[in-house]
A protein has these predicted regions:
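Signature of the catalytic double-stranded beta-helix
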Residues: 105-171, 188, 195
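N-terminal auxiliary "cap/dimerization" subdomain that precedes the catalytic jelly-roll/cupin core
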Residues: 1-130
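Extracellular structured ligand-interaction cores
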Residues: 55-57, 161-163, 198-204, 213, ...
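Short, flexible loop/turn elements at secondary-structure junctions
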Residues: 62-64, 167-170, 181, 205-207, ...
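A structural signal for short, well-ordered beta-strand segments and their strand-loop junctions
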Residues: 58-62, 152, 163-165, 215-218, ...
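Catalytic core of Fe(II)/2-oxoglutarate
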Residues: 228-298
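Generic recognition of flexible, low-complexity loop/linker segments
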Residues: 46, 190-193, 268-270
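Catalytic core of non-heme Fe(II) oxygenases with the double-stranded beta-helix
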Residues: 171-249
């Protein structure tokens, strides 16, 4: 991990939030903690604060250096290693390397076979000891009182969910506004629901930055886990009008990581501008029900 050391004291929101991190004006609903990856051990309760609601998002700078990220982008562009490629709905102009559980269109047995191959390819993508599992998950653990972060186990011994997915967003690619907790209502989550708490959050590692757009935008609209169905149920007509909501949008550099209370807060990815693909790794996560670990999936 690289990058100069900075002090990351808990300050009043207006002091803690830097305009370089946000597109638009600071909004008081969003409490942001920013730190350098090398300072993670100074913030061992950061993710606990996020789960409790006193922090809404955490930006970790320089998890990877830009040179390595460019190499990873080159390999992803060449589809090397040959990850399973799946797609968002066509209008989103985006795709996955790996299988997004929310959009899973295969049977569980096939999914867990694909997950085994996916993890092999993921190991090949990064230099030894610098992969998502060995670097990012350990970083998250350091920000969560050293609680282990790992791929959620499958229903049978030796099975596990895909730890993450790599996402490519082409020109015009975007993701509509949603809260992640609503995903748990879908059939693919039936087994996972038996393992984890109802409140999930997520991390996004920016691997390749687009020419413009592709920002993660979070809205001043919060839905508790027990009310997630309100956004997932098409029969509910009183859904939020985004034009009436305050929001913040984050500008990250390649190698930066953001952790967001995406389970409760409405959020989206704004359309990508230009021909440079936006590449990320994205994992969802939630407390194991015994609270001794955090389980992750893509």
């Amino acid at each position: 991990m690289t990058g100069p050391t900075i002090q990351c004291h808990q300050l009043p929101f207006q002091e803690r939030l830097r305009l370089s991190d946000l597109l638009g004006h600071p909004k008081p609903f969003f409490s942001l903690l920013e730190l350098q990856a090398c300072d993670a051990d100074q913030h061992g309760s950061a993710i606990a604060q996020l789960r409790q609601g006193s922090v809404t998002g955490i930006i970790v700078r320089n998890v990877y250096d830009s040179v390595l990220m460019r190499r990873i982008v080159e390999r992803l562009e060449q589809h090397d290693p040959p990850f399973l490629k799946t797609w968002f709905p066509e209008k989103f102009k985006s795709w996955f390397y790996g299988q997004n559980l929310n959009l899973m269109q295969t049977d569980p047995e096939t999914y867990f076979q694909q997950a085994e191959v996916f993890h092999q390819h993921m190991t090949e993508l990064f230099p030894a000891g610098q992969g998502i599992d060995s670097c990012v998950m350990k970083l998250l653990s350091r920000l969560d009182d050293n609680r282990p972060y790992r791929a959620a186990p499958g229903p049978d011994p030796g099975q596990s969910y895909m730890l993450t997915t790599f996402r490519g967003h082409g020109e015009g690619g975007y993701i509509t506004a949603h809260c992640d907790n609503e995903q748990s209502l879908r059939p693919a989550y039936e087994h996972l629901q038996t393992l984890v708490s109802s409140h999930m959050y997520s991390m996004v590692l920016l691997i390749g930055k687009p020419e413009g757009g592709g920002a993660l935008e979070v809205f001043d609209y919060r839905v508790e886990p027990e009310n997630a169905r309100l956004l997932n149920d098409d029969s509910v007509t009183s859904k939020p009008d985004l034009t009436q909501l305050s929001s913040v949008a984050f500008s990250l550099n390649a190698g930066d990581l953001i952790i967001v209370d995406s389970g409760r807060y409405l959020h989206r990815v704004t359309p990508v501008a230009g021909q440079t693909t936006r590449w990320t790794a994205c994992s969802f996560m939630a407390h194991a029900k015994d609270r001794n670990a955090v389980y992750c999936w893509g």
